[in-house]
Amino acid sequence: MGARKRISAEARKEAQKTMYFAKLNNVPTSPRKMRLVADMIRGMEVFRALGVLKFSNKEAAARVEKLLRSAIANWEQKNERKAEAGELCVSSISVDCATTLKRMRPAPQGRGYRIRKRSNHVTLFVDTLSKNDSQN
């Protein structure tokens, strides 16, 4: 490995140590429906976000709640202590399209209508709240 490549790899590795995230792949929910739930908690303090997700009536909220609990556990594992209230926030959450299953539905006059069963990938990052962010 070259010197410049090694330096950039070490920098990436150091940056990875301070990132706390969880990924959820191939969720059988349409990305549009999942983004509604993701927009509800983006930038929120994690325990407040858990409360919002718990009382949301959307099906995707239960999946995102489980993902958020996993991200909090990842943070606790790396820092070797429990997260306190007001310490962590959802720094970013992204919902990307995954594979789409294509099915046919019988239609009049021998035709077939296409049914697209969409799925998505969700990536959630948590980060510590800094002093200036706590004013919000």
Curated annotation (Swiss-Prot):
Keywords, ordered alphabetically: Ribonucleoprotein, Ribosomal protein, RNA-binding, rRNA-binding
GO-annotated biological processes: translation
UniProt GO MF annotations: rRNA binding; structural constituent of ribosome
Pfam families in the cross-refs: Ribosomal_L22 (PF00237)
CC annotations in GO: cytosolic large ribosomal subunit
Subunit organization: Part of the 50S ribosomal subunit.
Family: Belongs to the universal ribosomal protein uL22 family.
Role this protein plays: This protein binds specifically to 23S rRNA; its binding is stimulated by other ribosomal proteins, e.g. L4, L17, and L20. It is important during the early stages of 50S assembly. It makes multiple contacts with different domains of the 23S rRNA in the assembled 50S subunit and ribosome. The globular domain of the protein is located near the polypeptide exit tunnel on the outside of the subunit, while an extended beta-hairpin is found that lines the wall of the exit tunnel in the center of the 70S ribosome.
Name listed for the protein in its UniProt record: Large ribosomal subunit protein uL22
